[in-house]
Amino acid sequence: MKKFVVERNLPGAGNLTTEELQTISQTSCEAIDELNKPYHWIQSFITSDKIYCVHIAESEEVVREHARLGKMPVHTVAEVKAIIDPLTSNPLE
């Protein structure tokens, strides 16, 4: 399985209410159930006009199928090739 970052253009996303975010979350979970394939939604980050989601799936096509089933916009899907953090700056001893 691969990790993907999904960029969704959604004007006004930063102004979504708690209830609206809950509905979006429920819709995503329902779409995952409908996929009937291995799939994990890790988390999403809401900005002013976009939502960035982290998903684990077999392929980009499966990620796009999840979006189609949930009627969610998809601007880009990018496969994560590496993850770094502050600890990356220190060589292993």
Segments the model singles out, each with a brief description of its role:
Residues 6-8, 41-66:
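Short, well-ordered beta-strand segments in beta-rich or mixed alpha/beta enzyme
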Residues 37-43, 76:
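A short linear hydrophobic-aromatic micro-motif
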Residues 56-83:
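An amphipathic, aromatic/His-enriched active-site/gating alpha helix that lines ligand/cofactor pockets
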Residues 1-33, 40, 50, 85-93:
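Short S/T/G/P-rich N-terminal loop/turn motif that feeds into the first structured element of a domain
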Residues 34-35, 69:
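Alpha-helix C-cap/termination motif
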